[in-house]
């Protein structure tokens, strides 16, 4: 994937994620927000908050590289060849589709793998964190406020531990989920799309916790970039996995 094309897709993904976070707040389920000093106040704009989670070259004020001046200009019609930029309504529609997928996934309990005894103390802590993240934002806030040690473990996770946290959070017991006919053709690969939706849900649940956790969650969402690109970008994904208008989410 060309560098400029990848950066453009990552920017689109950030906008989808910002719209997804905005849906959660509008629905009355704000992300966890531990107390901060005035010097630690986060920007209220979701997109700005997400960019602060990324390395400078990918998020905070990265200056676009200057293109060399062309020697000639192509002769082509000025209409009908390339789509215009996506609108806020488009990102909101993608976020709505992802929200529907999240609701479908969360109807199923966590994987039976979580029922057995943990093999290590580290695994036990990660399972405890997953159980915490299954709660509503208000409950997460209350438990983290009463257990600073647990919050410290959560915001200081290593990348390897976070990868395991993602694996546990996204593992669902498919046997308990009723089958439901979806309108239109099925998505090109339902499992990656469902995992991507859950990755955004995890980002929503940890977005206000600070530390390295928010950045790791956003980078995990960006790890789906090759898959998104292979299926025609967000436009292609929405075209083959449309919003189910029979689910009144708004």
Curated annotation (Swiss-Prot):
Region annotation Disordered: where it falls in the sequence: 24-46
On this chain, the residues bearing Phosphoserine are 29, 37, 111, 158-159, 161, 189
Per the record, residues carrying Phosphothreonine are 33
Keyword annotations? Apoptosis, Methylation, Phosphoprotein
List every position bearing Omega-N-methylarginine. 60
Q: Which GO terms describe its cellular component?
A: membrane; nucleus
Q: What is this protein called?
A: Bcl-2-like protein 12
**The organism of origin for this protein:** Homo sapiens (Human)
Task: Report the gene name.
Answer: BCL2L12
